[in-house]
């Protein structure tokens, strides 16, 4: 997701991009060889944006095991994926941070609200550096409405997943389209 690099540049933070392998998977060797003692974190999108595929679980776990810094997984599209979130791995990986959003599956991009899941230690640090009153009253109200109507959200996600499969079938019927990659977003 390109906005991470934009935000890093605005804050004068050096970034290193490591291209994905064929089939849009993490090149673990290349990532680990690109990091050094100054590298503080690795950002991963899974499902990936823009390719839409899930990254291989074992590759992500290898990065979390072998990298001596924070591994941040952007799960903005996880609700559309067949696999579940990495949230269940938080107790096993103290260097893991997971971000999610109200923008995609919850269909509330306009309220600009996200969630961060991490160890108590990491959350404690983040709470010390976040701006005061960082979520306005209108956003809080709308988010509460969404959470209180969660069943509606679950139905909407299933409809989107079903429509995605229909779209893939239709793309596969177009003779000039050479290949339709699977999508988890």
Describe every region a protein language model picked out.
Residues 1-44:
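PLP-dependent aminotransferase-like
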Residues 9, 25-37, 50-105:
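Active-site pre-lysine segment of PLP-dependent enzymes
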Residues 15, 34, 173-185:
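Short, intrinsically disordered, charge-balanced linker/junction segments flanking boundaries
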Residues 15-19, 41-47, 71-74, 181-183:
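Short beta-strands and strand-loop turn motifs
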Residues 20-22, 46, 101, 120:
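Active-site donor-binding loop signature of nucleotide-sugar glycosyltransferases
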Residues 45, 79, 117:
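Conserved residues at the C-terminal ends of beta-strands
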Residues 95-172, 179-180:
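PLP-dependent aminotransferase class I/II
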């Amino acid at each position: 997701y390109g906005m991470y690099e934009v935000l890093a540049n605005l804050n004068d933070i050096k970034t290193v991009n490591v291209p994905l392998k064929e089939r849009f998977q993490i090149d673990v060797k290349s990532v680990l060889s690109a990091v050094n003692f100054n590298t503080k974190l690795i950002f991963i999108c899974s499902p990936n944006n823009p390719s839409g595929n899930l990254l291989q679980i074992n590759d992500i776990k290898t990065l979390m095991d072998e990298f001596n810094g924070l591994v941040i997984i952007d799960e903005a599209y996880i609700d559309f994926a067949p696999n579940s979130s990495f949230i269940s791995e938080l107790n096993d990986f103290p260097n893991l941070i997971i971000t999610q959003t109200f923008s995609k599956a919850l269909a509330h991009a306009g309220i600009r609200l996200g969630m961060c899941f991490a160890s108590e230690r990491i959350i404690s640090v983040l709470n010390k550096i976040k701006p005061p009153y960082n979520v306005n009253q209108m956003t809080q109200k709308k988010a509460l409405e969404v959470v209180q109507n969660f069943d509606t959200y679950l139905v909407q996600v299933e409809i989107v997943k079903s429509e995605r499969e229909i779209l893939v079938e239709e793309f596969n019927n177009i003779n000039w389209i050479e290949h339709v990659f699977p999508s988890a977003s």
